Amino acid sequence: MGKRFARMLRDKEQPTAYGADQRQRNEPNKFQVAYLGSLEPGHAHATAHKLAKRIDVIENNEPGAIDLTENDLVFITNGGCVENSSMGSQDKPAAYNTELKPGGGWDMWRKIAAQDPVFGHPDKFCHDPEQTNWMSATVETLDQKIIPYIKNICKRDPFTGHVVTGGIVTVKDSSWLMSWTINRQPQFRDQPKDHCLVWVYSLFTDKPGDYVKKPMRACTGKEICMEWLYHIGVPENQIEDLASNSANTVPVMMPYIDAFFMPRAYGDRPKVVPDGTVNFAFLGQFAETPRDTIFTTEYSM
């Protein structure tokens, strides 16, 4: 499947052919709104005036288009809390990529919102990744050497097939504000039965650690594991050996993961069906819905 980019035309006289000018050809995710007043009086949508007219498609590097009518439905996931996320490895930090590039959910939302305030204000959420980023890491234990320290805290054996931590364990005095959790094991069908998966995350990625004296965002997976081992009580003379040989740790940096928690006012997120729209709607954490849920319980795709 190729990437699909949506574009709305500002008025019905504007050329509808893909690449009507070179700027549009270079920015196929341009999304413009048509203010259509041409519907016949008495038509079901005669008073509505925002209509999605066309979806430009790039598939196998070839441009194409899907023409739309008022009977079609277009669903838009605007923004995106995991956009620009990156993975590291045991020996490599996860990159901190904050630049929002053309083609992503934030770029598309900005282009939509620039045409009508009814489409919200994306920069309320994505203007400062220093306020919205945090990191997670998956620690896979490779033998039994770390397990006793886990048992000592959660008072449960992670290999019984039952609940392990029963929730999040937060290290309150951690400079990174580290937390960790272990779900019912095994988590994956092909996971070795004697391996345990631990999810570690921290909110302050710019602060030096308590054991590893560097910010989490600059740490390899091994170094993040060392910081976690320190906080679960592993003797300092064993920490590096266990992080190197008894675990494999994969870090993930998410620059916009907390974007939906940024201060906002009513109207900063568009309604699911904005006033006056005919055939398109917004979905996800950045659409205004009554009694919505957020963060790991939401419905965005």
Placement of each model-derived feature along the sequence:
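Short His-Asn-centered micro-motif
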Residues: D11-K12, Q32, I76-N78
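A conserved short coil-to-beta-strand element within the FAD-binding core of flavoproteins
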Residues: F31-N61
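C-terminal segments that line or cap access tunnels to active or ligand-binding sites in enzymes
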Residues: N71-N78, V82-S300
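Core beta-strand elements of the Rossmann-like FAD/NAD(P) dinucleotide-binding domain
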Residues: N61-L73
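Acidic carboxylate-rich catalytic motifs and surrounding loops in phosphoryl-/glycosyl-chemistry enzymes
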Residues: D11, A34-L39, L242-S246
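Rossmann-like flavin
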Residues: M1-Q14, Q22
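Acidic, proline/serine/threonine- and glycine-rich low-complexity intrinsically disordered segments
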Residues: T16-A20, N26-P28, V33
